[in-house]
């Protein structure tokens, strides 16, 4: 039968095997085999290709070399033979629309391999004349594409390229087929071909269909001919399956629907698990009474159209051509896995017992009623299902017992083994109205776009790039960073881990037995029912462990009975055994206090559901009793775990999914450890003391997406499938390019990624050192101004944050992710908002900041290189005598040894002049007497020689009385002169003491003033510290605010949002799938709300920081680089002098120096003067103000001009005024409605309030007496008291300084100071005599030693003289020994 089917499929195209394949264009011959090979049709296949394709008609080619134009065009194709000549193509609207996009393509003459063409899709300002281009410069605006593309075409290869458009779909036929989605209304083309052998043009106006027969791979296995009959049906319904089981991208999905069990998507995009992975496509153009058996356990027999996959189907899709109605007499028989055969039948009669069954294929005018037909050994039962739609286009049957008609689920049964289709034949051989296809498919995750309930296009989510697009619910993504989920490889059955404290564990079974019997005429009546629990009506667990087992003993003489449970308990009968823990657990068939209920239902084959029994569970939470799937008894640690793989765990009551890893840590306290959000981080095995970490099975990663490919991944894991891994601060980066990125196309914060996937830090913008000359000048500071420093902090950027929505909400739970697909748009909005805001901020910050390495080095004192400066060269060394104020000569060291130094007090230069005159001679003592202030004086120190001289003079004068009395005059004069010296010395000392006291008192006054300044400095410092504290507080708030927001976001994970638990895995372990979905949906909604709040806060912060960044740029330009003329802009209050800026965390800290005014003068300002009604004058300078001042006599008024910046009144001069046209002041009358046109931000508050009040409903407010009025006021008492306390503390400090100043003023000391005079006195004569005697003795002794020793000494000579008399016997001579040095 399969051979017959494929024979009729091949019959219409058999003549193509012998038809000529050549195409004549412009007197040259080519073919379309290479062109059709771009469709990648897998052999063997017979398909019809339809659309805007090139025609084989030779007259449709344009062969001229001039400019050709055409309208109403939907595509243009170019045929290339050889010669490498160029061409120009322009595509636009007609009439031309400058607000729309136009396409321009130009290829210059170049036959080499480096040939390029320039393609532009831009908004051109006017209708341009077609012409060549040489670069990327264009007059177009808002270009979507403006690049050079490869355009090398090999000679003699029958190349055909082109571009077609239809609505929003643009198809490019180049080296392969590319599809783009661009909204356009193109209809006019203009072309120019430089040589007809290189660029013969063909314009396409209408669709063209080709019958394509692919017998083998390659161009030689392609045969084609124009399709002439039933072309639309073939093209819309038949395709050749790709090698990977995918449906070709160009397929129209005619009569293919999105399967749904509830509501049907009308328009939009959705990620869904659908039977779209094709194993085999059977194309049957003719039906000849088939009764075909399709098994879900084996592959489909027959010849598949396109590629075939050896895989058992999960769903069979029957695609029907609805051009006319074909009554498929018979039914669809469903063979269940239980061995029961059920029939899906339809009839236009509502009475199935009298109906003739037939399933209409196509459109019908009468309704058809569908039933489920069940045949038993003695009767037939029909169960009504639904009414068929007026037009049947597709029927889908899955192995899971689902039957879909036009995408809607009509029937849901258990597992199926096979399905049988029974139809009768009809029509003639050339009648293909019953054409249909059968597709053997499997379920796969896919992104599906639906328009009007029909599938428009799909994207299979089976590779990393496609999975990324599916997660973003987008067929096309912009370049950027996107979150992806990295899941460890799992087996189908995940291992289970259970950890608890060691204890004595006994075990018991809770056996629940449900007995029921169905009978009666309808076979749906419950005849008997009984339920026992371990043989009784109730049972309470009294062991440490237990296992619930449920037994059904249900009988029905008419067929099988299915069962189900309905529970309002936080668990099911099956999930209790999944290591759920309790403190108390009882079950009963009768009502218990505070118990929850589980109802058990039975569903007979041909009736409605009946409640068999109700079980009541009374329990309390705890860890005393644990449900286990099997007994775990004994005094032992019954814990078991699987390490280093993804496992489902129950650890000390925590349920979840993660990877358990042994660590080297040792923790004394506790047995399990959680995060702030309640997530399990680690636990300790109390038996061994080992600490194990618990990490998620899936990790959030960021994929770098560039040019429709993932070029790199930012991950917290060190292992990856990429070839290169780089460890960066805080994460690992995986890519196939390990080089450093220098030209990033993606920028996120300070990280950039290149097209190749390499990563690097974004290079800073470097600026040249700006050399500004230093200008000095004198300025005048008003006395009523005070200088102050104001601090201001402006934030420049935020710390970028990226949130993986799926990971945050579901924490890797697969079922939760399926539910989250309903909220995929919300997740995409959240993630894209954060990503785009962070990238925009990164671009703005990087373009704002520039770095100068030289300026940075000069500005940093720690790195300033000052080694070349030797300041010691300018420091000289000299001996200075502070007493004389001159450089004096000091005695040598030897002189200090030979003389005694006596320190006395002297008068100025008296001692020095005396020493210079006497030159050490005692007899010149009186001769060298000095005069000081007219009084003769002598130095007060007398040496021994002078003492003996004056003593001899005194004795001589006393010896002979009056005769020798004159000899005592020298003594008298010397004594008087020395007494005068002492008297004058005393006077000088007193005057010096007075000067010193005055100087000390002046110093005390200066110290007092200094303390006054210190007091004022403390006050100013207090104010300065206060302003700096405010700035630092703002910096701290900026740095900590984002961390607080993230912490708050994390805390939300421990909230259950009215679900039974905040753990998703715990919910699914306790409840059945439907009940758990309801609970998890609450968690999803709550966590998405928390994410939305966080994103809204973050986006608001981005907006604030963007405004702050712009303000910082203005303040740098106006305050730092220049002097601001705006009052209060730099510093908040006062006239700006200069500003300094310093880098701060995430921003800039400004230090503004301003003049703050203290006093103000109120004047009456005048805008202008009008003289005699003829001359009108106004001030020339805008910074001046004209005002009046009445004289004290009130007899006249004076006019003054002053600067607005400082009150400096002066008489006006002629140069201050400028004459204007007239004294008439012109006003423009506006209504309140017109004022916003002039002042857009003007708001009429009164009118707005009136409108609000008018819109309020007229109601009488309640009477609220004041005695019951409760108002809450902002209490700032504590803050005010703290400020007053600080002020009082500063005042007390000031008073203490004042007390110290008074004490210093009262401490005036009269000091006595005596000048120091150094006088050297010679030793007496007997000292010198002793010295001479000692020297003579020493010298004599040395001379004697020298002449008395040695062979030439005197003793030796004397000995030789007397040798003859005293010589003894001669001794034998001896040989002298030579010294020998042995090395």
From Swiss-Prot:
Keywords: Coiled coil, Glycoprotein, Host membrane, Host-virus interaction, Membrane, Signal, Transmembrane, Transmembrane helix, Viral attachment to host cell, Viral envelope protein, Virion, Virulence, Virus entry into host cell
Region (Fusion peptide) location: 955-975
Signal peptide: 1-25
Gene Ontology cellular component list: host cell endoplasmic reticulum-Golgi intermediate compartment membrane; membrane; viral envelope; virion membrane
Membrane topology label: Single-pass type I membrane protein
Topology Virion surface: residue spans: 26-1324
InterPro entries per the UniProt record, alphabetical: ALPHA_CORONA_SPIKE, CoV_S1_C, S2_sf_CoV, Spike_S1_CoV, Spike_S2_CoV, Spike_S2_CoV_C, Spike_S2_CoV_HR1, Spike_S2_CoV_HR2
Region (Interaction with host ANPEP): 617-745
Region (S2): 735-1383
Motif position, KxHxx: 1379-1383
Residues annotated as transmembrane: 1325-1344
SUPFAM superfamilies in alphabetical order: Coronavirus S2 glycoprotein
Residue segments, region Heptad repeat 1 (HR1): 969-1088
Annotated spans, Heptad repeat 2 (HR2): 1240-1336
Pfam families: CoV_S1, CoV_S1_C, CoV_S2, CoV_S2_C
GO biological process: endocytosis involved in viral entry into host cell; fusion of virus membrane with host endosome membrane; fusion of virus membrane with host plasma membrane; receptor-mediated virion attachment to host cell
Highest rank taxon of the organism: Viruses
HAMAP family from the UniProt entry: ALPHA_CORONA_SPIKE (MF_04200)
Role description: S1 region attaches the virion to the cell membrane by interacting with host ANPEP/aminopeptidase N, initiating the infection. Binding to the receptor probably induces conformational changes in the S glycoprotein unmasking the fusion peptide of S2 region and activating membranes fusion. S2 region belongs to the class I viral fusion protein. Under the current model, the protein has at least 3 conformational states: pre-fusion native state, pre-hairpin intermediate state, and post-fusion hairpin state.
Protein family: Belongs to the alphacoronaviruses spike protein family.
Domain writeup: The KxHxx motif seems to function as an ER retrieval signal.
Protein name per Swiss-Prot or TrEMBL: Spike glycoprotein
The organism's taxonomic lineage, starting at the top: Viruses, Riboviria, Orthornavirae, Pisuviricota, Pisoniviricetes
Gene from which this protein is expressed: S
